Amino acid sequence: MPADIMEKNSSSPVAATPASVNTTPDKPKTASEHRKSSKPIMEKRRRARINESLSQLKTLILDALKKDSSRHSKLEKADILEMTVKHLRNLQRAQMTAALSTDPSVLGKYRAGFSECMNEVTRFLSTCEGVNTEVRTRLLGHLANCMTQINAMTYPGQPHPALQAPPPPPPGPGGPQHAPFAPPPPLVPIPGGAAPPPGGAPCKLGSQAGEAAKVFGGFQVVPAPDGQFAFLIPNGAFAHSGPVIPVYTSNSGTSVGPNAVSPSSGPSLTADSMWRPWRN
């Protein structure tokens, strides 16, 4: 018996040796596995940063609005963000009002700069081929809406743009020129489907240029979101001694004005009597 026990004890280390030799270390994790394993930690850190920033923003906005923080201890995240947006808008209006009181031409400069940028975008889209027509129309319509909102912007102590005196005509008998910091040119709407002005040739467009912005004789045609088109007329075209009466062209080619008559009630006006701003 003792011999058998000694034999078993002596053989047990030898039997365990091959098992320990055959063990292999764990394979290193790939980049995707590492990102997957660390994603919960990163998400936790991200939420902690958001909550910390919102907490600081809450303290700042309550101090700026001079509100008691004890009464607003349970503000939701959306409420904090809305209060911040409103406060920043009020600050922006106050800064614009202060700037206008110092220099009344600030708003005019802003409008002139926006109008110039809009003209550059329209000119690029009019001459660039391969641009999707739907995207082009949506972009030009969005810019036209923004231009309308900017023209309607008023601040305390400043008259409405519609009540302001028209800008003086540019000096010299040359073509239409924009004076420095002049307000944006007016838009003359034309019903959808109207024929383009025959006085000028359109610039180079893509295959679907019929629905995009065009330039005829120096005047830009901007499509509106409701399917109509509008002429972008320079200020120099309105430098007349008498009042200017806009004339709209319909699909039939007849003019519609204060003295116009329908084809059924009387003879239509001739082509010479139609006012064409794109002709000198």
From Swiss-Prot:
A motif (WRPW motif) lies at residues 275-278. Residues 10-21 have a biased composition (Low complexity). InterPro entries: bHLH_dom, HES_HEY, HLH_DNA-bd_sf, Orange_dom. Keywords: DNA-binding, Nucleus, Repressor, Transcription, Transcription regulation, Ubl conjugation. Residues 164-174, 181-200 have a biased composition (Pro residues). Residues 110-143 form the Orange domain. Residues 1-44, 157-200, 254-280 are annotated as: Disordered. The keyword DNA-binding applies. It comes from the Eukaryota. Pfam families: Hairy_orange, HLH. CDD domains: bHLH-O_HES1_4 (cd11459). GO terms for cellular component: chromatin; cytoplasm; nuclear matrix; nucleoplasm; nucleus; protein-containing complex. (Microbial infection) Ubiquitinated via human cytomegalovirus/HCMV protein IE1 that assembles a HES1 ubiquitination complex; leading to HES1 proteasomal degradation. Residues 254-271 have a biased composition (Polar residues). The keyword Repressor applies. Residues 26-35 have a biased composition (Basic and acidic residues). Residues 34-91 form the bHLH domain. It is found in: Nucleus. GO terms for biological process: adenohypophysis development; amacrine cell differentiation; artery morphogenesis; ascending aorta morphogenesis; BMP signaling pathway; Cajal-Retzius cell differentiation; cardiac neural crest cell development involved in outflow tract morphogenesis; cell adhesion. One of its GO terms (molecular function) is JUN kinase binding. SUPFAM superfamilies: HLH, helix-loop-helix DNA-binding domain, Orange domain-like. Has a particular type of basic domain (presence of a helix-interrupting proline) that binds to the N-box (CACNAG), rather than the canonical E-box (CANNTG). Transcriptional repressor of genes that require a bHLH protein for their transcription. May act as a negative regulator of myogenesis by inhibiting the functions of MYOD1 and ASH1. Binds DNA on N-box motifs: 5'-CACNAG-3' with high affinity and on E-box motifs: 5'-CANNTG-3' with low affinity. May play a role in a functional FA core complex response to DNA cross-link damage, being required for the stability and nuclear localization of FA core complex proteins, as well as for FANCD2 monoubiquitination in response to DNA damage. Transcription repression requires formation of a complex with a corepressor protein of the Groucho/TLE family. Interacts (via WPRW motif) with TLE1, and more weakly with TLE2. Interacts with HES6. Interacts with SIRT1. Interacts with an FA complex, composed of FANCA, FANCF, FANCG and FANCL, but not of FANCC, nor FANCE. This is Transcription factor HES-1.
